Regions:
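Conserved small-residue-rich beta-alpha loop and adjacent elements
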Residues: 1-51, 75, 97, 119
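ALDH superfamily catalytic-core signature
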Residues: 76, 82-168
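Hydrophobic residues in well-ordered beta-strands that form the structural core
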Residues: 27, 33, 58, 102, ...
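Short beta->alpha connector loops at strand-helix junctions that form conserved
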Residues: 23, 28-30, 58, 80, ...
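Short alpha-helical
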Residues: 6, 32-35, 62-63, 83-84, ...
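Short amphipathic alpha-helical segments
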Residues: 12-13, 38-39, 69, 88-92, ...
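A structured beta-alpha segment of the ubiquitous adenosine-cofactor-binding alpha/beta core
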Residues: 55-78
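Generic hydrophobic/aromatic pocket-lining and core-packing "Φ" positions
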Residues: 15-16, 65, 86
């Protein structure tokens, strides 16, 4: 079960290992980005993937993801997405004691020490927070700065953040 951001990568990271291990799969792409998964499935079919090895379901999580994660014939559920949905999937999967792999969004800190290359640290913290509009599970959502560097770092970060152009 994959999220809407980076739809081809997220799907590939799930489907590739499943196929490499000799497994079949049922893919449930986020309802906001189903076409990416549809195109990948068409490409897999064109490359000779046998019928039934790869299966795609589309729709909202309540209608598709819940039944998929509850189904007794599904041995494992891999999910990338938010914590609330991850908890629902874990609870559903627990009913049939299936294995789960849950990659849930986190609070990823950037830790900046005084001996760091200052400009590189500011640029990387800025990129970590705003890359892909911050819609990345590994986005730097917190910055921990050594106290002696704090004010200078905040000033530089704010100055550079104010220069970001939106909607180019």
């Amino acid at each position: 079960i994959t999220p809407w951001n980076y739809p081809l990568l997220q799907v590939s990271w799930k489907v590739g290992p499943a196929l490499a291990a000799g497994n079949t799969f049922v893919l449930k792409q986020a309802e906001l980005t189903p076409h990416t998964a549809m195109l990948l499935m068409a490409a897999l079919k064109e490359c000779g993937l046998p019928d039934g090895v790869g299966n795609l379901i589309t729709g909202a999580g309540a209608n598709c993801g819940n039944p998929l994660s509850q189904h007794p014939d599904v041995d494992m559920v891999s999910f990338t997405g938010g914590l609330v949905t991850g908890k629902i999937i874990a609870k559903n999967a627990a009913e049939t004691v299936k294995r789960t792999a849950l990659e849930l969004g986190g609070k990823n800190p950037n830790v900046i020490f005084a001996d760091a290359d200052f400009d590189v640290a500011v640029d990387n913290a800025l990129n970590g927070a705003f890359f892909h509009s911050g819609q990345v599970c590994s986005a730097g959502s917190r910055i921990v700065v050594e106290e002696s560097l704090h004010d200078k770092f905040v000033d530089a970060l704010v100055e550079r953040a104010n220069k970001i152009k939106i909607c180019l």
